[in-house]
């Protein structure tokens, strides 16, 4: 399971979606980043899977 979360430039959550397929999650992440500016995908345990766009400063630096 992969959860993709989209954020606006202020770091506010705009949309979130869960996918079972890793490739579908990657495509969703790219689509959401184009709509909102930044999106990231995490796995079932909250580990970073991928992101697209410019990470808002309000979210802080991502720890991998």
Where are these regions (language model features)?
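Short, mixed-charge low-complexity intrinsically disordered segments
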Residues: 34-64
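Charged, amphipathic alpha-helical segments
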Residues: 20-28, 62-63
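Short aromatic-glycine-(Arg/Gly/Cys) micro-motifs in beta-strand/loop hairpins
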Residues: 1-14, 43
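Short stretches within intrinsically disordered, low-complexity N-terminal or propeptide regions
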Residues: 8, 26-27, 41, 60
């Amino acid at each position: 399971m992969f959860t993709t979360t989209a954020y606006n430039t202020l770091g506010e959550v705009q949309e979130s979606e869960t996918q079972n397929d890793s490739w579908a999650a990657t495509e969703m992440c790219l689509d959401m980043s184009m709509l909102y500016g930044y999106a990231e995908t995490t796995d079932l345990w909250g580990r970073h899977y991928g992101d697209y766009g410019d990470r808002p400063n309000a979210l802080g630096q991502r720890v991998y």
